[in-house]
Curated annotation (Swiss-Prot):
Annotated gene: AKR1C1
Site for Lowers pKa of active site Tyr, residues: K84
CC annotations in GO: cytosol
Lineage: Eukaryota, Metazoa, Chordata, Craniata, Vertebrata
Family classification: Belongs to the aldo/keto reductase family.
The protein's Enzyme Commission number: 1.1.1.-, 1.1.1.112, 1.1.1.209, 1.1.1.210
Localization: Cytoplasm, Cytosol
InterPro entries: AKR, AKR1C, Aldo/ket_reductase_CS, NADP_OxRdtase_dom, NADP_OxRdtase_dom_sf
Binding site for substrate: Y24, H117, H222, W227
PANTHER family (alphabetical): ALDO/KETO REDUCTASE
Pfam families for this protein: Aldo_ket_red
Residues engaged in binding NADP(+): 20-24, 50, 166-167, 190, 216-222, 270-280
Protein name, as recorded: Aldo-keto reductase family 1 member C1
Gene3D superfamilies the UniProt entry points to: NADP-dependent oxidoreductase domain
C-alpha cells in the first residue's frame, strides 16, 4: 500500500486510513464551502473523510464525494466516510432513522463508520440544541447500552460498516465493553487530542482493548466563540513545536500531526485552505526521532479546548473523570 493510504486494521476487520480530513467549520463559514474543501482533500490524497449530522454539511460533503467518484478519481470503496449520531437521537428507536437521514443527505448507501457523537443525551426532536425558555439545555435520560445495541443493528443492516464512539471516558467505554450480550466492541473513540492534551492514559486504555484512538482538534482548535476560551494558548505557536518544525523544515502543524501517527493515533486534519490541505498530506514524508517525541510528550498540560461545559450536569458528562 502506498504511504499516502496507510491504514490501521480495526477490531472488526475493516481498515481505516490513519490520516483523515475533518469537515467541521465554524457557523460563519458558508456550508457549501465544504464541497470545494472535500473535493480538494480527495484530490490531494485524503481517503478518510469525517463529518457528522451536527455539522449540517453532509449533503455538501456527500456531493463532493460523489462528484469525485463520478469523475473517476476514486471508487466508493476507496473512501472511508464517518458520520455521527447526535445527542437528540440516543433513544434506541431513533438511532437507525438518524443514520438513514444522514445517508439520505449524503446520497450514499452506507457509511464506513458511525459514532455516538457525545455521551450526554438531549431531548428528542428537530432541535439540535434543545433549550427551555430560560436557555437551559433540555436533557434526556437514556441508557447508552441500549443506544449501543441500536448501533449494532445498524452494522448488521449494512448501513454502517463499523461502529464506534466519540468523547467517551474510560468508565463509559468500560460500560459498553462489559455490557451483557455485547455483539461488537466500539472500533474507536474519537476525542480531542493534541500535544497540550495528549490523552496518554486514555490512549493506553484504548490500546489495551484494541480500540483505536482518533484525534480531533489535533492542531489545537478552530477557536470558535462561544465554544473555546479565547485566552487559551495557541498550540501551533508553541516554541517546542516551532523549533521542531524548523529542524525538520516542516510546519508546526505537520509536527503535531506526525506526533499522533507515531504514537498509534489516527489523526484528523481540518482545513478549508487549499495549500494547507495539500501540506497536511506530507505527514508521511518524514519521521520524528524518539527525542523529538519525548519533547512533544513534555508539552502535555491538560488543556482541553472543547470543554463543552453546556453539557455539564448530567452524570454522563464525560470530562469530570480524570480520563
Amino acid at each position: 500500500m502506498d504511504s499516502k493510504h496507510q491504514c490501521v486494521k480495526l477490531n472488526d476487520g475493516h481498515f481505516m486510513p490513519v490520516l483523515g480530513f475533518g469537515t467541521y467549520a465554524p457557523a460563519e463559514v458558508p456550508k457549501n464551502k465544504a464541497i470545494e474543501a472535500t473535493k480538494l482533500a480527495i484530490e490531494a490524497g485524503f481517503r478518510h473523510i469525517d463529518s457528522a449530522h451536527l455539522y449540517n454539511n453532509e449533503e455538501y460533503v456527500g456531493l463532493a464525494i460523489r462528484s469525485k467518484i463520478a469523475d473517476g478519481t476514486v471508487k466508493r470503496e476507496d473512501i472511508f466516510y464517518t458520520s455521527k449520531l447526535w445527542c437528540n437521537s440516543h433513544r434506541p428507536e431513533f438511532v437507525r432513522p438518524a443514520l438513514e437521514r444522514s445517508l439520505k443527505n449524503l446520497q450514499l448507501d452506507y457509511v464506513d463508520l458511525y459514532l455516538i457523537h457525545f455521551p450526554v443525551s438531549l431531548k428528542p426532536g428537530e432541535e439540535l440544541i434543545p433549550k427551555d425558555e430560560n436557555g437551559k439545555l433540555l436533557f434526556d435520560t437514556v441508557d447508552l447500552c441500549a443506544t449501543w445495541e441500536a448501533m449494532e443493528k445498524c452494522k448488521d443492516a449494512g448501513l454502517a460498516k463499523s461502529i464506534g464512539v466519540s468523547n467517551f471516558n474510560r468508565r463509559q467505554l468500560e460500560m459498553i465493553l462489559n455490557k451483557p450480550g455485547l455483539k461488537y466492541k466500539p472500533v474507536c473513540n474519537q476525542v480531542e487530542c493534541h500535544p497540550y492534551l495528549n490523552q496518554r492514559k486514555l490512549l493506553d486504555f484504548c490500546k489495551s482493548k484494541d480500540i483505536v484512538l482518533v484525534a480531533y482538534s489535533a492542531l489545537g482548535s478552530h477557536r470558535e466563540k462561544p465554544w473555546v476560551d479565547q485566552n487559551s494558548p495557541v498550540l501551533l505557536e508553541d516554541p517546542v513545536l516551532c523549533a521542531l518544525a524548523k529542524k525538520h523544515k516542516r510546519t508546526p502543524a505537520l509536527i503535531a500531526l506526525r506526533y499522533q501517527l507515531q504514537r498509534g493515533v489516527v489523526v484528523l486534519a481540518k482545513s478549508y485552505n487549499e495549500q494547507r490541505i495539500r501540506e497536511n498530506m506530507k505527514v508521511f514524508e518524514f519521521q520524528l526521532t524518539s527525542e523529538d517525541m519525548k519533547a512533544i510528550d513534555g508539552l502535555d498540560r491538560n488543556i482541553r479546548y472543547l470543554t463543552l461545559d453546556i453539557f455539564a450536569g448530567p452524570p454522563n458528562y464525560p470530562f469530570s473523570d480524570e480520563y
